[in-house]
């Protein structure tokens, strides 16, 4: 089971992961199953060696939980086998859609409507039934707000999770990015109203500032102070401290800087003075 603070596994960082010291703050890794289901060769051997040392969380990119196309059962079965192979007990994916007659290669927003709540929750239940375990859904960054919305973002997230009986994967950077870009829901209001009992996993990441009113969720920069403050607030609001992962996808600094950010997560967890829960 995963617990405490972790770092997303990227092939560019393989040698660094293989060289982790015993006192490294990195307690688990996360990988996108789509990147590994058909991967072999040296890259897979490195991944396997790291996954033998550290617990693994799986975070999907293409389940298209809110999409209209039929669910990809081959993908779900592949994820189930990967979870079995690596003794992985946690899987999450985005509350979005990414298929429309083919892969769209982006995570597109869903309209916050009752109809979409029922549609998405039904599909999540199908995924859970096929996987044989509970999953978690992540709040995504979005750049176009649907005029069809009947509720705000956190109400939609709560409603889907409640109807599907799934966990909530909270991305604090996405909360901040959406608050700045749309001005519809403050980060504080989001955290005050999220179903805290369902929050079982957290992401934190950096973003790019295009203009003061436009932030882009890139995972290509260090976490900014405003987002660290939001993580601290999240820990204060939640009954227990979920496993929390630092996402970094490119523009990699020296690995010691990434470890320092993971250590900062661990420090915030300790200062919160609450039980650290396991995600399963």
UniProtKB/Swiss-Prot annotation:
Domain of life: Bacteria
Record Gene3D superfamilies: Divalent-metal-dependent TIM barrel enzymes
Protein family per UniProt: Belongs to the UPF0276 family.
Listed PANTHER family: UPF0276 PROTEIN HI_1600
Name of the protein in question: UPF0276 protein NMB2142
